[in-house]
């Protein structure tokens, strides 16, 4: 008796349901947002990201800078030219920050 190589409709439906279940349960990939410090400013000054994402600050200035959260939840030591520091954001919220050495330098991170 010949064997059919054609998939039955029920097999196709089960396979589709399986693939959709895998896709729906796959964890989101965390993203890294880079904020550059240059000319006494953060670029971008305002960043929006998802919970689980990381913000990396890179000092492109020829001056030492530091990162300080307005609410004290994170801070860095002084960053020399080319130095970088990363902060993961696990939960939602709005986080204002500034340079600890130059308080007029400000930014905001919104975590959704």
Where are these regions (language model features)?
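Extracytoplasmic copper-binding redox domains, predominantly the cupredoxin/blue-copper superfamily
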Residues: 2-11, 15-20, 25-112
């Amino acid at each position: 008796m010949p064997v059919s190589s054609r998939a039955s409709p029920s097999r196709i439906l089960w396979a589709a349901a399986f693939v959709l279940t895998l896709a729906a349960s796959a964890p989101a990939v965390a993203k890294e947002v880079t904020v550059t410090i240059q000319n006494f400013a953060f670029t971008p000054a305002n960043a929006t990201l998802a919970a689980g994402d990381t913000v990396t600050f890179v000092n492109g200035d020829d001056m030492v800078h530091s990162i300080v959260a307005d609410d004290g939840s994170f801070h860095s030591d002084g960053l020399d030219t080319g130095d970088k520091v990363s902060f993961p954001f696990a939960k939602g919220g709005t986080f204002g920050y500034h340079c600890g050495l130059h308080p007029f330098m400000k930014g905001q991170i919104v975590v959704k």
